[in-house]
Amino acid sequence: VSVNIDALSGTSNSPIYTLVARTLTVPRAQVVLKVQRPIVFLTSEERSFGQTKSNDQISNRLRNLLANNGFEFTESKSSADLWFDVKADAEKGSISGSIFITYLTSVIKVAAVKEGKEIYATTLDRVKGYGLDYDKSSVDAYNKAIETLEKERMNELLNIVLQ
């Protein structure tokens, strides 16, 4: 890094200024930047009607979104910078004709591991899903929650986490 002496003169083209500027010793500094990607430990507990789901839809999508934004993942919490914890459960709602309604509530928390401090939390509360049976309506509710996460919450999450 060094000072640009020519920029200090502005629009002046004075030959005297040029002569003086050449005789000045400009301080210089070398700066070494270590660019490091945030390392994430991700845990999840996704359920439908109290039963553990075979696939973790929200956490898988969150992992994909974070990876696309430059985050790396680890299986060891102690080596992580951030801990993302996803908890979600779908509950049975009503039946209207042949349409089954399910409500999904999901909580996503982010903690700084080394400080042991929660830095972000959001809730996707009672996201409504529809289907021809409760299982299909649960999948629909999870899909709508993922859409909400992507479109409404992801930018906020990234802004807070990357500060």
Feature roles, as predicted:
Residues 64, 78-120, 125-127, 132:
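Surface-exposed short loop/turn segments
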Residues 52, 76, 93-94, 129, ...:
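Generic marker of "main functional regions" within proteins
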Residues 113-160:
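Short secondary-structure boundary motifs at beta->alpha junctions and helix caps
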Residues 5, 16, 39, 58, ...:
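Weak global preference for isoleucine
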Residues 51-59, 101-103, 134-143, 147:
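Solvent-exposed, acidic/flexible segments
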Residues 1-63, 161-163:
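A structural "domain/chain start" motif
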Residues 69-80:
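Short acidic low-complexity segments
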